[in-house]
Design a protein with these regions (language model features):
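C-terminal binding/interaction regions
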Residues: 2-30, 37-44, 49-137
């Protein structure tokens, strides 16, 4: 299994404790964004937004994020067709993170695929069972 595939499909816990430090070191001015299904309350995934991504999200009424790996705007669904229509945006008490309450147009949300070959409905598809081990939820 490739390293990327092992990270996304494996059963070993390999948290990236340095993610936020790397963003800061590269001068990326972003805040975390929790994307939540507006009807079920399920957390779909966590992304990042800068001021431009938030502006585009509000204007388009669809989830737009900042891709920290590609250093560019990421209009969720533009490539995959898995659009996330915006219901509302909330900000936390310290104004250092956002909550996008969204409705997926299709069943798919995550860029990973389940055993059936379809995009997963959320990115939280494994649970932590120990300090080193995961299992599929």
């Amino acid at each position: 299994m490739s390293a990327a595939n092992e990270l996304e499909e494996g059963r070993a816990l390999r948290l990236d404790w340095d993610k936020l430090a790397k963003l800061g070191a590269r001068g990326q001015r972003v805040v975390p964004v929790v994307l939540q299904h507006a009807d079920s309350g399920d957390v779909l995934f966590v992304g990042y937004a800068n001021d431009e991504a938030l502006r585009e999200t509000l204007a388009r009424r669809q989830a737009v994020l900042w891709s920290t790996s590609r250093d560019e705007l990421w209009h969720k669904g533009a490539t995959s067709g898995d659009w996330l229509d915006l219901v509302e945006v909330r900000v936390n008490c310290e104004q250092n993170s956002l909550l996008y309450r969204v409705r997926p147009r299709t069943g798919g949300v995550c860029h990973t695929r389940g055993p059936d070959g379809r995009a997963r409905a959320r990115c939280y598809y494994r649970r932590v069972v120990s300090e080193r081990e995961l299992e599929f939820a």
